[in-house]
Amino acid sequence: MKKLISVLMTVLMLVALAVPGMSVLAADKQVTVYIEGYGHGIYSDTKNPSAENQIFPTESILEPLMGIFNDLTKDLVNGLVTGDYTEYCDRIYNAIAPAYADLKLDKNGEATDGSGCGKDMLTDSYYMENYVNSNNIKILFEYDWRLSVEHNAEILEKFIDRVCREQNVSKVNLLGRCLGGNVVSAYLQNGKNLHRINDVVMLIASTEGVDFIGALFSGKIKLDAEAVDNWANYFLSQEGIITDPAMNDFVTSLVSFINQIKVLGFGLDFVQMVLDEVKENVLARTVRDTYGSFPSYWAMVPDEYYDNAIDFIFNTDELKAEYEGLIEKADSYHDNIQITARDRMAELKAQGKDFLVISKYNYPNFPLSKDADAQSDGTALTSATSFGAVCAPYEKVLSGKYINLLTENEKKYLSPDNMIDASKCLFPDTTWFIKNCYHNNFPHSMDKLIVRFFATENMTVFTDTVTYPQFVDYSKETGEITPVEGPDDLPTETEKTLVVFIRFFTNFINFIKKLLNGELGSLFG
């Protein structure tokens, strides 16, 4: 008996000694739950998420339109002559809407047809990987990005409990990217287990909306020649849309050339005129039967557009009644989360939660709205993803008058290139800006900043101004980030005009030479 007691005592002592060791391990182990933006695969049958049943991603909506281009041209001419654009609108709608027939939700904004992301985050296995180093683990939260973000936030709450239990940790970090930031915001507003959250990262979060989505959903589309020029030059040349270099150079320089001689503006005036004639017919119903059926996309309509968007898409009392369930979900996010998000984050910050905000800049905005010249990451406005930064327009700097009015303390948050004033951000001390890093680009160097934030108590933009100052510049060539340097040498209007003319004629001559020699490749890859 004594021997048995002695063995039991030894076991108990070993267990007692092991408990503190387990606590230390759990404390050192950083687990991050990563909520991506839209884009997870959607399947027609969630019980059989196979390639044959995948309904998202779908083909580009431009592809059906290209097949009816000739007929569209005839319908447009007929509309211009008669003033009746019905056939033109019907042809566009009938080309686009069928592509989303399987993907769209019902009139309550719900998936009642058995479609979904094909993953139950409360029971199925989840994807996890080391995050920068072996002390950090990143776990992916997969969800049906079409649904209400509040619905997905409820699932996230339960998933966090599951992760803590299975990973043997008491807390996790949250990382919300783009639409994932909306889900995080909904969770922070309504979650019952916020004691399980350590740090929160809002990575180019669309919590407060995306400008071009607001313009499309509200019908308040405004075309501007300078914005089209900026957008075409960046996206055609930098994103490799046109694969033949000579063709690409010619097209981009042609856009700039016709803008400089004021012809582009006249052309856009015509497009704007047609758009104003047809938008209530074709745009409203096309949006309603595609992305407008997703409560999640309504969560990305900025507050300034929201009321107009509801009235534009559901433009009769009958439609409002018919889509009452969807509108209720949209209203709930707008009224209870979007317009209170900053106050809620500030409240949680005061309670001890740490927030890291990462925004990006130096890209043209989509040329569709009154803010087409605003600073952006190519998708979302920098002022929105930073929760309040004051930004110079694209390819411009803040005025000397504005800078002179800043206090000495506020000037600490001024970007070296004079494009961003971060002093007006919700969290100016923990908001970083990455220059020249496109919205959909998430380099390893950025991940290292995030992990450094997790590991450093009370880290701010002033903690390490050599490696991680508030404003960093991303290099496509090296994949690294370095401190942003002084003001860019931006050309004057006279210099820009001269450069545009020289560039156009040089590329035009090169284009003609290659055309005559049969050296041009295909237009698109």
Give names to the regions the model predicted.
Residues M1-L4:
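Positively charged n-region of N-terminal signal peptides that target proteins for export
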Residues L8, Q167, H195, A350-Q351:
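A structural signal for short coil/turn segments at secondary-structure junctions
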Residues M9, M13-L17:
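Hydrophobic core
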Residues L17-D28, G525:
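Sec-dependent signal peptide cleavage junction
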Residues A27-L175, G181-F235, P364, S369-T506:
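N-terminal non-catalytic accessory region
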Residues I139, Y143, L147, E277-A372:
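Alpha/beta-hydrolase fold catalytic core
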Residues A225-D317, A321:
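Alpha/beta-hydrolase-fold enzymes
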Residues L498, I502-I509, K513-L520:
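Membrane-interacting alpha-helical segments
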